[in-house]
C-alpha cells in the first residue's frame, strides 16, 4: 500500500464516509441501467468519488438505488459551464445542511455542491485539504499547508475551521501532514502523519473547540497516523505502519516492513492501546463497529488481505480473509462504507489506469452486486 499521502486515498472516512439522509427532491441525471437488487435500506443514493489518475481530474458519480441507474460525472452534468471540471485528486467528502463538501487535494480547493442537484455553490481555497468533519455550525478540514514531499523544510500542517453559512475561515497549526480528525467531548482530535518527513509523526493534536486552540498533544504508540473515528467513548486511529524501500541488483524496489498497519484506541485521558492483530489500511465506522481491511501477513513478507470487524465496546474482532471468500472479487481495495440499515458492505476496487469498481456484500459477506465506476474510486457516501 502506498505511504505517500498525496497518492493515498481516504478517506475514509476515516475518509471516513458519512451515512446521512438528504431531502428527497427528484433530480434526473443521465445514466445507464444497473442491477443493484431491491433491499438497499432506506437510502436512495450512493455518491461515489473518483480520485482520477494522479494528478488527473476527479469525478463524482451517483448510484441511484431507486431508479436502478448509474450516473457518471454528475458534477459535469450539473455544471457544464465549469470547463475545468470538479478538480484534481479528491480526498474526502461529507454532507451537511443539504450540501456536499468535496476536498480536492491537488487543486488546493474545497468544492461545495448543493444537493440533490450537484450545482456548484462555492469554491474555497484550502492548501492540500485531506479530511473533513462537521461539528456544530463549522466544517473542520485538515490541511498539509503547502508541505512538499522530499523538501528539507518541515512545514507544520493546519486545521481549517469554516463557518458553513458565511464561509468565514480560521486556522490553527497542528503537527506534520495531518490526516483524519474526530470530535469527542468538545475536543477535536487530529491525526498527524508526518508522511512527507523521513521521521513520521506520532502526535495527536487535541483542539478545544470552544477556543479553537491546541490544548495538548498525545503521543501515540505508533507513527504515520491516518484515519480517525469516535466510538464507545474513545477515539480510534489507524496507522500506515513503517517500511523502507531498497533496490535489488536488478533494480526492482523491495519493501521491508518494520511496523505493521494498526488500529489504536485513545482514551480522553490520553492513554492508548494498540489492538493487536488488526492491520487497518482503510476503515469506516457503523454504529459501534469498525470495519477495516489490511494485509494480515505484512510482517512476514506475505500477502493475506483480510477484512476486520472490530467491536469497539470490548475490542474483540472477527477476521475474514479475502482469499477463499466472495471478497476475492476485490483486486485492490481502496475504500469502504457500511450501510447502517441493512449491514451491506461497499468496497471500492480501484484502478488508476482504467475504470474501477464498487462491490456490495451483505452482512454475511456474500456478494450482492458490482458496478463499474471511474478512475481511482476511493470514497463513498450514502444518502
Regions from the language model: what does each represent?
Residues 1-4, 21:
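Positively charged n-region of N-terminal signal peptides that target proteins for export
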Residues 15-18:
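C-terminal motif of bacterial Sec signal peptides marking the signal peptidase cleavage site
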Residues 20-383:
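Predominantly soluble domains enriched in secretory-pathway, periplasmic, or organellar proteins
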Residues 3-6, 369:
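Short, basic/polar N-terminal leader/transit segment immediately after the initiator methionine
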Residues 5-13:
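Sec-dependent N-terminal signal peptides
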Amino acid at each position: 500500500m502506498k505511504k505517500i499521502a498525496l497518492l493515498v486515498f481516504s478517506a475514509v472516512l476515516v475518509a471516513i464516509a458519512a451515512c446521512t439522509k438528504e431531502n428527497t427532491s427528484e433530480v434526473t441525471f443521465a445514466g445507464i441501467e444497473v442491477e443493484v437488487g431491491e433491499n438497499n435500506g432506506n437510502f436512495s443514493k450512493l455518491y461515489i468519488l473518483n480520485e482520477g489518475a494522479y494528478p488527473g481530474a476527479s469525478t463524482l458519480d451517483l448510484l441511484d438505488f431507486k431508479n436502478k441507474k448509474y450516473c457518471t460525472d454528475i458534477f459535469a452534468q450539473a455544471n457544464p459551464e465549469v470547463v475545468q471540471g470538479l478538480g484534481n485528486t479528491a480526498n474526502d467528502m461529507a454532507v451537511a445542511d443539504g450540501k456536499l463538501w468535496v476536498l480536492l487535494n491537488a487543486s488546493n480547493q474545497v468544492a461545495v455542491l448543493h444537493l440533490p442537484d450537484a450545482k456548484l455553490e462555492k469554491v474555497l481555497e484550502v492548501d492540500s485539504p485531506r479530511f473533513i468533519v462537521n461539528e456544530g455550525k463549522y466544517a473542520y478540514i485538515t490541511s498539509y499547508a503547502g508541505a512538499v514531499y522530499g523538501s528539507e523544510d518541515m512545514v507544520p500542517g493546519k486545521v481549517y475551521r469554516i463557518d458553513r453559512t458565511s464561509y468565514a475561515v480560521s486556522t490553527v497549526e497542528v503537527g506534520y501532514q495531518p490526516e483524519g480528525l474526530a470530535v469527542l467531548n468538545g475536543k477535536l482530535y487530529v491525526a498527524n502523519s508526518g508522511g512527507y518527513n523521513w521521521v513520521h509523526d506520532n502526535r495527536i493534536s487535541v483542539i478545544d473547540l470552544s477556543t479553537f486552540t491546541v490544548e495538548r498533544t498525545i503521543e501515540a504508540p505508533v507513527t504515520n497516523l491516518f484515519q480517525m473515528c469516535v466510538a464507545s467513548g474513545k477515539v480510534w486511529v489507524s496507522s500506515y505502519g513503517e517500511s523502507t524501500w531498497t533496490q535489488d541488483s536488478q533494480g526492482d524496489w523491495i519493501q521491508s516492513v518494520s511496523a505493521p498497519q494498526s488500529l489504536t484506541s485513545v482514551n480522553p485521558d490520553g492513554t492508548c492501546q494498540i489492538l493487536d492483530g488488526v492491520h487497518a489500511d482503510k476503515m469506516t465506522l457503523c454504529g459501534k463497529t469498525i470495519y477495516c481491511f489490511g494485509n494480515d501477513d505484512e510482517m512476514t513478507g506475505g500477502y493475506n488481505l483480510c477484512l476486520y470487524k472490530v467491536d469497539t465496546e470490548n475490542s474483540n474482532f472477527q477476521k475474514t480473509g479475502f482469499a477463499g471468500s466472495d471478497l476475492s472479487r476485490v483486486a485492490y481495495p481502496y475504500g469502504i462504507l457500511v450501510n447502517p440499515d441493512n449491514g451491506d458492505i461497499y468496497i471500492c476496487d480501484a484502478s488508476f489506469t482504467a475504470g474501477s469498481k464498487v462491490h456490495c456484500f451483505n452482512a454475511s459477506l456474500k456478494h450482492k452486486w458490482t458496478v463499474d465506476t471511474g478512475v481511482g474510486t476511493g470514497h463513498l457516501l450514502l444518502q
